């Protein structure tokens, strides 16, 4: 009896009383996970895959399962129970649906045609807040792979043509029998293209593409935000051997603005005002994103941090007629470098001040006095 083989039930990760439906479900899940084509270059996956196949071939058959439950792996050694000769045939039918799941995508890619879609490209573009407000058309230059004109994208030297791969017959994939199961792999001779090039084009060295600088116009709509993505269909890399081109994706980032901070469609700015304007009230002008100006009126007694809303002076909303607002936050600036006369006037003002002129300060110091008074009276 073998001492190296793992229990078939453990291999399929099921209980010994598992029914046929549970066995099949477990088998499909593990086969998809460990299939060598999904784990290229990993020999352990191939070993694991073989173990899964062997376990399922035994446990799905009522007679073989009964023999295994009674005698273990010894039931199939030294010719026992047919010497395991029936595994190969059973494999093909058991795995037909698995292969459809694994290789269905390959069939849709145009197996045997050799055509491949070009890669998508990414281009990072920084724009100003004004650009996002108004919208613009920008010109960009990018290096991109285009179809080689010398060979029309075939990769073969002028006057010659690619030949159908003799290894796979143009299918792009080959099947290889390994014991009781068959693996389908990418053809090693043509790398899945279905064609081979004996005399490559000297301009593109057989790739069918060359790199060139391309100038493109990018339409940036009003209201774009940081991180907005713009897709230019068909402006990516050229496809291989007549395949369709990829797409170009423009990723926008907004440069920091000297005056405004953006929050969605709203704009925010901080404006310093004099102590006199804050105390007596008044008005001042602020710039707007459309390079205009607007007036902001402040009431008397305005404190630092107060915000004023200016409706409709924010950013346009992308693909909408809506427009955000602009918020102006005032910062009361304390005067510096006072003259002697100014100092005297402020000192006189301080003497004339009462609790009504500085309610927050009076309230704060009253709380401080109360706090220390309560500590002094504590036992």
Curated annotation (Swiss-Prot):
Residue stretches making up the J domain: 7-72
Protein name per the record: Chaperone protein DnaJ
Family: Belongs to the DnaJ family.
Residue ranges covered by zinc fingers (CR-type): 135-213
Glycoprotein as UniProt keyword: no
One GO location term (cellular component): cytoplasm
Gene: dnaJ
GO biological process, one term: protein refolding
Function, as annotated: Participates actively in the response to hyperosmotic and heat shock by preventing the aggregation of stress-denatured proteins and by disaggregating proteins, also in an autonomous, DnaK-independent fashion. Unfolded proteins bind initially to DnaJ; upon interaction with the DnaJ-bound protein, DnaK hydrolyzes its bound ATP, resulting in the formation of a stable complex. GrpE releases ADP from DnaK; ATP binding to DnaK triggers the release of the substrate protein, thus completing the reaction cycle.
GO molecular function, one term: zinc ion binding
Pfam assignment, any one: DnaJ_C
Subunit relationships: Homodimer.
UniProt remark on cofactor binding: Binds 2 Zn(2+) ions per monomer.
Binding annotation for Zn(2+) 1: 148, 151, 201, 204
Domain notes: The J domain is necessary and sufficient to stimulate DnaK ATPase activity. Zinc center 1 plays an important role in the autonomous, DnaK-independent chaperone activity of DnaJ. Zinc center 2 is essential for interaction with DnaK and for DnaJ activity.
Originating organism: Rhodopseudomonas palustris (strain TIE-1)
Binding-site residues, Zn(2+) 2: 165, 168, 187, 190
Family matches, as PANTHER family: CHAPERONE PROTEIN DNAJ, DNAJ HOMOLOG 1, MITOCHONDRIAL-RELATED
Gene3D superfamilies, sorted: DnaJ domain, Heat shock protein DnaJ, cysteine-rich domain, Urease metallochaperone UreE, N-terminal domain
Classification via PROSITE patterns: DNAJ_1 (PS00636), DNAJ_2 (PS50076), ZF_CR (PS51188)
CXXCXGXG motif repeats: 148-155, 165-172, 187-194, 201-208
Record localization: Cytoplasm
InterPro entries with a match to the protein in the record: DnaJ, DnaJ_C, DnaJ_domain, DnaJ_domain_CS, HSP40/DnaJ_pept-bd, HSP_DnaJ_Cys-rich_dom, HSP_DnaJ_Cys-rich_dom_sf, J_dom_sf
Keywords, ordered alphabetically: Chaperone, Cytoplasm, DNA replication, Metal-binding, Repeat, Stress response, Zinc, Zinc-finger
């Amino acid at each position: 009896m073998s001492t190296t083989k793992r229990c078939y039930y453990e291999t399929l990760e099921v209980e010994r009383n598992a029914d046929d439906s549970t066995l099949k479900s477990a088998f499909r899940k593990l086969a998809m996970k460990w299939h060598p084509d999904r784990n290229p270059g990993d020999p352990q996956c191939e070993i694991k895959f073989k173990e899964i196949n062997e376990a399922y071939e035994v446990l799905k058959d009522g007679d073989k399962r009964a023999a295994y439950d009674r005698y273990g792996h010894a039931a199939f050694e030294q010719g026992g129970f047919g010497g395991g000769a029936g595994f190969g045939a059973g494999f093909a039918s058991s795995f037909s649906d698995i292969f459809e799941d694994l290789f269905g995508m390959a069939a849709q890619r145009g197996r045997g045609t050799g055509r491949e879609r070009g890669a998508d490209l990414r281009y990072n573009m920084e724009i100003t807040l004004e650009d996002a407000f108004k919208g613009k058309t920008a010109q960009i230059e990018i290096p991109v792979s285009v179809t080689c004109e010398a060979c029309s994208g075939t990769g073969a030297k002028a006057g010659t043509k690619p030949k159908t791969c003799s290894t796979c017959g143009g299918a792009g994939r080959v099947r290889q029998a390994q014991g009781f199961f068959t693996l389908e792999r990418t053809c090693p001779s043509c790398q899945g293209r279905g064609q081979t090039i004996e005399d490559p084009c000297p301009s593109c060295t057989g790739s069918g593409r060359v790199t060139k600088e391309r100038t493109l116009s990018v339409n940036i709509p009003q209201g774009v935000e940081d991180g907005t993505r713009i897709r230019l269909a068909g402006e990516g890399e050229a496809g291989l051997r007549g395949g369709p081109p990829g797409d170009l994706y423009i990723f926008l980032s907004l440069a920091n603005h000297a005056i405004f901070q953006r929050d969605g469609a709203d704009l925010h700015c901080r404006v310093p005002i004099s102590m006199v304007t804050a105390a007596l009230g008044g008005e001042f002008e602020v710039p707007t994103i459309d390079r205009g100006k607007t007036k902001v009126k402040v009431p008397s007694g305005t404190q630092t941090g107060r915000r004023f809303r200016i409706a409709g002076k924010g950013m346009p909303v992308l693909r909408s007629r809506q427009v955000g607002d602009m918020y102006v936050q005032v910062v009361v600036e304390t005067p510096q470098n006072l003259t002697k006369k100014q100092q005297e006037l402020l000192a006189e003002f301080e003497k004339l001040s009462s609790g009504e002129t500085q309610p927050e300060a009076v309230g704060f110091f009253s709380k401080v006095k109360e706090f220390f008074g309560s500590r002094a009276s504590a036992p």
